[in-house]
Design a protein with these regions (language model features):
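Aromatic (Trp/Tyr) and acidic
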Residues: 2-89, 121-143, 174-192, 196, ...
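Helix-terminus loop motifs that line ligand-binding clefts
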Residues: 40, 45, 50, 75, ...
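Amphipathic alpha-helical segments of tetratricopeptide repeats
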Residues: 103-104, 158-162, 202-206, 244, ...
Length: 661
């Protein structure tokens, strides 16, 4: 296979894009919270697996090295990206220390993973977990350019080429090492790496157990329960990575087909891949997604965006990160939920359908794959705000940031995704600064973008990456406005309930009816007892008291709960009012935008005493409604408890209620 790189777009070196504005504030909170401290909360699980090969033995000796490899590797991958995208000097120093310790722990044969003598080196998680740690080191190399780091990772990949040759391979997650192999191949051109990758594809083609083969990817069928939802989210870019390194176009089509059928069948309105009891499932109002799947899907979309140059992958990244990712984080960045759902009226130790504790908000759980991946998702998203193409700089995803590129500093000032205006300021910071050609992504949901360059309105194409016919230089100010029209989305849940509930979007944001919350902290069940200042949280809904006796109160609850709402079938976006309340500060705590939506009370659609969030009840596809119920919706990411998918009220019933008033 000829060494080539078919990627249309390329990332800038790690650290050349820094967070600013609300995103800078969020990264600072994360550094003070989980991002900067998880390795201290669970040292055996997170801090030491790669530096001393000591892991948390509570998992059992068979699982400890593999789970430690995955969890520690993904944490340090996120930690390193967080350090360099925030520019925090202490975080950067700790990243240096970790990388140096890992290299000092390298075996003579080049192996850098977490397995020790006596462990099963052909365990599936040796390949999968080790790839996580090696990707962390590659991120560090990307930021520092240290050749010894690249050589060490290269040597570790060659260890797998030698020791996992032929059919000495596994069928579950081990093949994810292909991602790391292709990255190292792109940096070294070592054909042995691509030969290993090709042999892995051949092995899975003959021994597929989880629909992970090229044939399964190319098939029009998506089989629910065929594989872990997070694994699917993580692997859809894998064939395309091979294509980028020289494989034929069948590999690219395999990834694109996996993306299309996953989006059609298993993508929730919040942008999360379904993970019902952690496995792929049909979409539904209360179907959960796992935080790992959120991070992995964002990563896969980013790789597909770079390989193909197509802007719609960036649209999807924003949907996933601004909704699913933000809606599963405590706003002080000190806890996340392992599993979350579009409709959720409680997030507690008993509310998940999958397992006890999976919806609770916690900084760390006994198997901390999701907490560590929550550290990585935002820095990785930020890295895709500006990409380099052959003809200049492409602004892809949008968030406030500062981009340093070829002697030019470009500051993006914006309240996006809440507000519509993005201001790009160009400033020369080096003697070798050059004029820049820039393209700006126009989201598919925006049909009337406006652009002003240095005070004068200019024409702009309305789709794809819009090229501005101007060489940007010192002092230029470019203002891009992306009008955010309200959109009504109808879920296609025919593989589940055929209820076709409605959701409301504006721009990239899903808007939800917030359920009043009460947060109750408790010590939790972490593997290592949490120190002072750290807790698990059960989040319960607040229901106003009726003042009636205990029996009448049971009947009155359906009138007192605030989330028993339906939307009219045929609801028009023109009926929805957008309000900018002028709020400044941290927007995920206090959204500057809300939507006023005409709703209707559905007193019999929601259980009055639920122990879990249930699908809203309907009869013949419609909710019974008895009065108008004006709704105020806020961004999904501003909520922990919410209703995002509303049952439909029949038009004739709605018209009757309107007539009565």
């Amino acid at each position: 296979m000829t060494n080539q790189n078919r990627q249309k777009l390329h990332r800038l070196p790690l650290g050349d894009i820094r967070a600013a504005g609300w995103l800078g504030e969020q990264l600072r909170r994360n550094i003070a919270g989980m991002g900067g401290h998880l390795h201290e909360l669970e040292p055996g699980m997170i801090a030491t697996p790669y530096t001393t090969r000591e892991t948390y033995e509570g998992w059992g000796r068979d699982r400890a090295p593999g789970w430690g490899a995955e969890i520690s590797g993904n944490y340090w991958w996120g930690f390193i990206e967080l350090a360099f995208t925030s520019g925090d000097p202490d975080m950067i120093d700790r990243a240096h220390a970790w990388a140096n310790a890992v290299l000092a722990n390298r075996r003579e044969d080049g192996y850098l993973g977490t397995y020790r003598e006596g462990d099963d080196f052909f365990d599936d998680y040796n390949a999968w977990g080790t790839s996580c740690g090696m990707n962390a080191l590659l991120a560090y190399y990307d930021a520092t350019g240290r050749q010894d780091v690249l050589e060490a990772v290269h040597g570790c990949m060659l260890w797998f080429c030698d020791n996992w040759s032929g059919d000495k391979k596994t069928r579950y997650a081990g093949m994810t090492i292909v991602e790391c192999m292709t990255r190292v191949y792109g940096l070294t051109g070592d054909e042995r790496l691509m030969q290993f990758c090709c042999s892995y594809f051949d092995f899975i083609e003959r021994n597929d157990l989880f629909d992970g083969s090229l044939s399964a990817f190319l098939s029009p069928e998506l089989h629910y329960n065929s594989t872990h939802g997070s694994l699917y989210a993580n692997e859809i870019d894998r064939p395309a990575l091979m294509y980028a390194c020289g494989a034929d176009e069948t590999y690219l089509e395999a990834s694109l087909n996996a993306y299309r059928k996953g989006k059609e069948k298993a993508l929730l309105p919040n942008g999360g891949i379904t993970c019902e009891s952690e496995y792929l499932a049909p979409v539904g109002c209360v179907v959960e997604t796992e935080y790992c799947a959120i991070t992995f899907y964002n990563k896969s979309l980013a790789n597909l965006a770079q390989i193909t140059g197509e802007p719609y992958f960036a649209d999807d990244m924003e949907q996933t990160v601004f909704n699913a990712a933000e809606g599963a984080r405590k706003k002080d960045e000190r806890a996340i939920a392992y599993l979350t759902a579009p409709n959720q009226i409680m997030a507690s130790s008993t509310s998940s359908y999958a397992n006890e504790g999976h919806q609770v908000y916690a900084p760390c759980v006994p198997v901390a794959c999701c907490p560590v991946n929550s550290v990585r998702v935002l820095p990785e998203f930020l890295r895709n705000t500006a990409l380099e193409g052959e003809d200049g700089l492409y602004f892809s995803t949008y968030a406030p940031c500062i981009v340093n590129y070829r002697g030019m500093k470009i500051t993006l000032e914006t309240d996006y995704p809440f507000r519509e205006t993005l201001t790009f300021r160009f400033e020369k910071v080096g003697e070798t600064a050059v004029s820049l050609t820039c393209r700006f992504r126009i989201p598919a949901w925006c049909d009337s973008p406006r652009a002003v360059l240095n005070g004068e309105e200019i024409a702009l194409s309305s789709d794809g990456y819009a090229k501005v016919a101007h060489a940007f230089s010192d002092g230029d100010v470019f203002v891009l406005t992306l009008p955010m029209q309200v959109r009504i989305y109808e879920m296609q849940d025919d593989d589940r309930l055929s209820m076709h509930p409605l959701s409301v979007f504006r721009g990239p944001l899903l808007y939800s009816l917030p359920v009043p919350e009460i947060w109750q902290g408790w010590p939790g069940h972490s593997a290592t007892p949490l120190p002072e200042g750290w807790q698990w949280y059960n989040v319960h809904p607040v229901i106003p008291p009726s003042g009636l006796d205990v029996y009448d109160d049971m009947g009155m609850r359906r009138r007192l709960i605030t989330w028993n709402a339906a939307l009219a079938e045929g609801l028009s976006a023109d009926e929805i009012t957008v309000t900018d309340n002028g709020a400044d500060g941290y927007p995920w705590e206090n959204s500057p935008i809300s939507l006023s939506v005409p709703g209707y009370r559905a007193p019999y659609s929601y259980a009055p005493y639920p122990q879990k969030t249930l699908d809203p009840y309907v009869q013949n596809g419609y909710a019974y409604v008895d009065e108008e119920m004006p709704l105020t919706l806020i961004p999904y990411g501003c909520t922990a408890l919410r209703i995002s998918c509303f049952p439909k009220a029949k038009a004739e019933m709605v018209n009757k209620l309107k007539g009565d008033n």
